[in-house]
Design a protein with these regions (language model features):
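Alpha-helix N-cap/helix-start capping motif
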Residues: 12, 60-61, 104
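Hydrophobic/aromatic ligand-binding patch that stacks against planar heteroaromatic rings
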Residues: 68-69, 113
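Conserved AMP-binding/adenylate-forming core of the ANL superfamily
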Residues: 16-60, 64-68, 84-89, 137
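Structural core segment of the AMP-binding/adenylate-forming
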Residues: 44-45, 74-137
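Residues at the C-termini of beta-strands that transition into short coil/loop
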Residues: 8-11, 22, 29, 123-128, ...
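A short N-terminal helical cap/helix-turn-helix that marks the beginning
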Residues: 1-17
């Protein structure tokens, strides 16, 4: 069975990987670079391979890219952005997540629960091409 990283490495750098209507395609080369950048950002935030990271983002190319890249550096748990505060509290506590990734500027129930649980909050800022982003704490 191949690991996710191996599956990505098997594609030519110029091949399209992630797209969205009206946006440029992210290539596999872009995805490989993003994977390294995400790993560096997570390690700088104190997140290791055995840690759990919840992702609370709208469906779309950034969610897809975040899942694929974070999963290569930590255990990843995508959560539904529509959850209410008590649902986030249940899932984040059950997961024992060390960190949560949210969109820059998001101030909803997931962030409030993460702060209550003293989790690391990582903000994702989308850019171009589709799926591309930066992370900051």
């Amino acid at each position: 069975m191949q690991r996710l990283e191996e599956l990505i490495q098997d594609h030519p750098d110029t091949a399209n990987a992630i797209g969205a209507p009206g946006r440029d395609w992210m290539t596999y080369g872009d995805l490989k670079v993003l994977t390294l950048n995400v790993r560096q950002a997570l390690r700088a935030a104190g997140i290791g391979a055995q840690d759990r990271v919840a992702i609370v983002l709208p469906n779309g190319p950034e969610m897809a890219a975040a899942f694929v890249t974070v999963a290569q550096s930590a255990t990843t748990a995508p959560l539904n952005l529509a959850y209410k505060e008590d649902e986030f509290a249940f899932y984040l506590e059950d997961l024992k997540a060390k960190a949560i990734i949210v969109e820059t500027g998001y101030d909803g129930p997931a962030r409030r629960v993460a702060k209550r649980f003293d989790m690391i909050v990582i903000e994702l800022t989308a850019s171009n091409p589709a799926g591309s982003f930066t992370l900051s704490t």
